[in-house]
Regions:
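Short polybasic amphipathic segments
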Residues: 1-5
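Short, charged N-terminal helix-start/capping segments
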Residues: 6-7, 31
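Short, mixed charged/polar active-site loops
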Residues: 9-11
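An extended, acidic
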Residues: 13-136
Length: 136
C-alpha cells in the first residue's frame, strides 16, 4: 500500500517484528472500556516499553507507517474499525478482536504491526475471557 502526500509517494509498512517489551502500545482512553477491559489492557501495557493515550484513529495511522506496534481498544462500533482494518492489513499488520477472531463488527480490537507482537499481547492479557461489552 502507498500514500500520496506533499512529499510524494510513500510506502505504508508496519514495523518489523519485535518483543512486546520493546513495543509502543496506544489506546484512546486509559480506562479502555469496562473495568475488566481496563485491567486486561493494563496487563499488556505494563509489559510494553511505552504506552500512549488519546490518539483515536491516528494510532492506526501511526501503526501503518511503522511508528508504533499495537493499538488496543474496546467498545468500538463496526463503523469505527472498517477503514482502519483495511489500511492496517494493506500495510502488513494484523487486526483481530481480543480473542483472535474477525474484528469487522467492532468491540474489542487488537491492531498489531505483526503476528508476533499480536500473539504476545494476546497472551499477556487481551485473550482473557471477558463478558461481552455493551455498545452504546
Amino acid at each position: 500500500a502507498t500514500v500520496n502526500g506533499p512529499m510524494g509517494q510513500a510506502t505504508l509498512a508496519t514495523r518489523p517484528a519485535r518483543m512486546l517489551s520493546e513495543a509502543t502500545v496506544v489506546t484512546t482512553f486509559p480506562e479502555v472500556g469496562s473495568k475488566t477491559e481496563e485491567r486486561a489492557f493494563q496487563t499488556v501495557a505494563r509489559q510494553a516499553r511505552l504506552t500512549r493515550y488519546g490518539l483515536d484513529c491516528y494510532g492506526y495511522a501511526l501503526l501503518t507507517v511503522g511508528q508504533i506496534d499495537l493499538v488496543i481498544e474496546a467498545g468500538l462500533s463496526s463503523y469505527d474499525v472498517q477503514a482502519p482494518i483495511a489500511v492496517v492489513q494493506a500495510a502488513g499488520g494484523i487486526v483481530t478482536n481480543w480473542q483472535g477472531g474477525p474484528a469487522y463488527d467492532g468491540g474489542r480490537i487488537i491492531a498489531a504491526a505483526n503476528a508476533g507482537v499480536h500473539a504476545e499481547a494476546s497472551r499477556f492479557g487481551c485473550a482473557v475471557t471477558l463478558p461481552v461489552s455493551t455498545q452504546t
